[in-house]
């Protein structure tokens, strides 16, 4: 496991990065290796029986919310969108054939059979995959390219997270216009109200209502399956669409126009990335069982049912999903669809929280407030800043685009762009992690990329129709993350140069016999081999040291979780000094007071390291950054980095330090 910088230097306002990955010089005292000896988490036996069924139902509520609500708008876009085709019998069979094979190839073959095998200690997703392949890259250019690729993929996921709640809830509420055309004007206001309540509810957490997400989606999939079977029974000839020849003849018959329809077909596989990203929550087997056992059959039946309806009534293309339902079941279907859309939205919102937490720990995002909303579930978190940004963007989309059909034009680019990034990173896994030969890895990569690129190109033509939004959102997020990374790296070098090797400092303390005062002083440092500048400033200005001085380093690693027995290394340095190095994965949030309180139980560094909270003072540095320094970073990036640093959550809050026990010392740094 390769070490990475900790999440923004703990000794700063939120600007300074960790320099732990930078050697402290040949004379530095060797710190315990943060990467040596780490073992894989204990492997649990694959779930079976009731446990497997429970996990599979849970996966329905989290993993399949996005792809599960696609029937609300997918075929409507294929036949009624700006690039849709006329719903003739041949076109209906052709589009349904493309739908079936897209689901089979992309979701079942690509993600289920291959991509989900590339896990980072059980975790999946763009950033986890980027961290996994980054360990094998030895060249600076190669690591930089992988970093840029992964960050852009993550940025696209944020665009996906903004669009999904808007399009899912809009698509569900639009059923009201089918049931009562006079109520069409109420669709947008009703959608806004639902989304406002959804984002306001986030601070309460999902611990209580999360248990019903799975059953809600179970009812949803059962409902769409029944509706689909009802449609198929009216015209079983739609089953001919399962033959790939209808898809091929569709392209031959419609040419370029037929190719553009892929921009609508791709909507049936939106959410495929969620299967991989949420792998750590449920495991591979429950996700596969839920897909093959219920989600895919239900979706396929519903799409075929909509197709059968279009064979019988081409005019139903204006909203084939709701027109598939009998009149008496329309309002119950709208209610179930709205509930499913809320569940799908919640899954994407929670995914954005998790992605941001990973980005912070991996050093690609400033610190933000992270609140744990459940004492039992470690992954249930709430990020207020992210929540309000997502909520504002979602409401703006609904008010700006007005209909799910218009939003569909914006949706595809984010999804297909992420798919391409995943394929490129997965190729590196096959070659570097699994050791596959070129002749074995390249054909699979080319096959995946051909399909991904076809979907992407079919969506690029929608740039003016709304495709610009996810690109703009991704470009903004990418700029912020890359700027933060570059700024942190530059600042890390400056802080390292301003520090002092630990062994030289310890020798100087022993020689000078500095006056000591009662109590414990804790200094946060990102470099285990060096002395933090704040300690040097404290000694220079105050001329005293506490009787116990603890140097704490928080090191983040490119794995999701660290085993508890390997969490902490501690040692006594002499002269009342102790060093504590704590290891965290990118899915974990450090709590320094709790960590120090646990040291006696861990039997590390002896009984002398017992921390008494009311006798302990935490010293942090607060740097004022200026943009007129020698760094080669462009001035506009320096200024952006400084703004981000000023608005980042304070180190004391992020690491859980008691505010009344924190002393901050200022310094000015020219970046």
UniProtKB/Swiss-Prot annotation:
GO molecular function: potassium ion transmembrane transporter activity; symporter activity
Annotated Gene Ontology cellular component terms: plasma membrane
Location of the region described as Disordered in the Swiss-Prot/TrEMBL record: 1-43
Primary subcellular site in the record, as a coarse category: membrane
Keywords: Cell inner membrane, Cell membrane, Ion transport, Membrane, Potassium, Potassium transport, Symport, Transmembrane, Transmembrane helix, Transport
Membrane topology: Multi-pass membrane protein
Pfam families from the UniProt entry: K_trans (PF02705), K_trans_C (PF22776)
TM helices/strands, residue ranges: 52-72, 92-112, 147-167, 181-201, 209-229, 255-275, 291-311, 323-343, 381-401, 407-427, 441-461, 465-485
Residue ranges, compositional bias (Low complexity): 10-37
Catalysed reactions listed for this entry: K(+)(in) + H(+)(in) = K(+)(out) + H(+)(out)
Function of the molecule: Transport of potassium into the cell. Likely operates as a K(+):H(+) symporter.
Protein name: Probable potassium transport system protein Kup
Organism: Anaeromyxobacter dehalogenans (strain 2CP-1 / ATCC BAA-258)
